[in-house]
């Protein structure tokens, strides 16, 4: 019913992008924690796997061994699909034997793609190839571009309904948590919401209390100045890339 990508980028940030013919997929599937890892739990989803998986990665357990232990304790593991990446970029994935075709996963350096009820294996391969080919993009946009590539390759064979993007960039709260719960074109809508977030939300979040600056920025003129700097930097970057 779903395909997703979980990734750790070169800056140590974590992200999950997911799309599905399943209402509000972002409420149950994607999970991440700064400095720890990212994961997606899907197919006949078991949301109870997420917390112990993150806890195990926080203890620097080997992801494949951790996942094996989690699945051994779940009598429904044959119906689950689960994949994750840790702070060292190590990935682990499971596609249960009772998951509905097409289903499967691929793991590459620092990321994993997994899906079920898909049009075919080309969906996860296109998603993975796109992510690998677009390292120059901002992390969130790179994830969205990969998701769109999977959609173009066939996506969920039942159709479209929901999509989500979750990114942690080193703080105890997400840098982005965008969800499209029910839409005719969820990935396009997710991209639109991401574009809207660039206007003020993303630069504003950089002014919030953080690990480095526990009180954040409270002077509104300084906040507006930061927003202007953010857009100036984006404009300069686009001109360099043109």
Model-derived features: positions:
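N-terminal nucleophile
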Residues: 1-242
């Amino acid at each position: 019913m779903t395909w997703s990508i979980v990734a750790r980028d070169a800056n140590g940030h974590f992200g999950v992008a997911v799309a599905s013919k399943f209402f509000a997929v972002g409420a149950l599937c994607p999970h991440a924690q700064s400095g720890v890892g990212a994961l997606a739990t899907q197919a006949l989803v078991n949301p109870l796997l997420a917390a112990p998986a993150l806890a195990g990665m926080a203890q620097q357990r080997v992801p494949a061994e951790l996942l094996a232990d989690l699945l051994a304790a779940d009598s429904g593991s044959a119906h689950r699909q689960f994949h994750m990446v840790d702070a060292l970029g190590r990935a682990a994935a499971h596609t249960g034997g009772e998951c509905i075709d097409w289903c499967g996963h691929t793991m590459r350096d620092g990321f994993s793609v997994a899906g079920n009820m898909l049009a075919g294996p080309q969906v996860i391969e296109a998603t993975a190839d796109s992510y690998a080919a677009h390292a120059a993009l901002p992390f969130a946009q790179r994830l969205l571009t990969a998701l769109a590539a999977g959609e173009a390759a066939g996506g969920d064979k039942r159709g479209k309904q929901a999509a989500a993007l979750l990114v942690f960039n080193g703080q105890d709260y997400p840098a982005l948590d965008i969800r499209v719960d029910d839409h005719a074109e969820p990935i396009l809508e997710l991209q639109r919401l991401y574009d809207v977030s660039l206007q003020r939300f993303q630069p504003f979040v950089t002014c919030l209390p953080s690990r480095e600056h526990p009180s954040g920025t409270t002077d509104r003129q300084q906040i507006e100045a930061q927003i202007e700097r953010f857009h100036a930097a984006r404009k300069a970057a686009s001109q360099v890339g043109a």
